[in-house]
């Protein structure tokens, strides 16, 4: 649904290029799918991952640790105060989950496709790099608009094979295979 919404908005608006802003699991692939289908110059700007937290000296992060701590709470090994403290540490800053889940996987593979500023997928959401990345994304959006650099001009089977190789190299989410296949199907 989001990919269709993105596609229709891109087709309906008189724009020369579009900066797609997303972050979590399904937003990035949906936006890219819509952009590929609309075949207008696009560049993705992801929000970046959150920082990890700490609970009783242990490094913790959203997604990876929440189920384990919730099970401990249900087993009454943690009390109400403990689980509140854990919750505050599982999501200590803004950003996508700070693990190699689908959000990080799709940011990295979208960068591998050439649809993002190089070295922008993993900069934390709260870092000063995010502003620099956003500025560079804006610069590139003007360039791709002037060159009318549509996805159909540079995305191909080799692009997606490269993204799959990157996916394997990073040990990314298996959801990445599904999303990359769906994105490639829009060419």
Language model regions located:
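Flexible, glycine-rich loop/tail regions that form catalytic "lids" or insertion modules at the edges
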Residues: 164-166
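Alpha-helical support elements that line or immediately flank enzyme active sites
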Residues: 177-187
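Active-site cavity-forming subdomains of large catalytic enzyme subunits
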Residues: 1-162
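Residue-level preference for well-ordered alpha-helical positions
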Residues: 35, 110, 168, 184-185
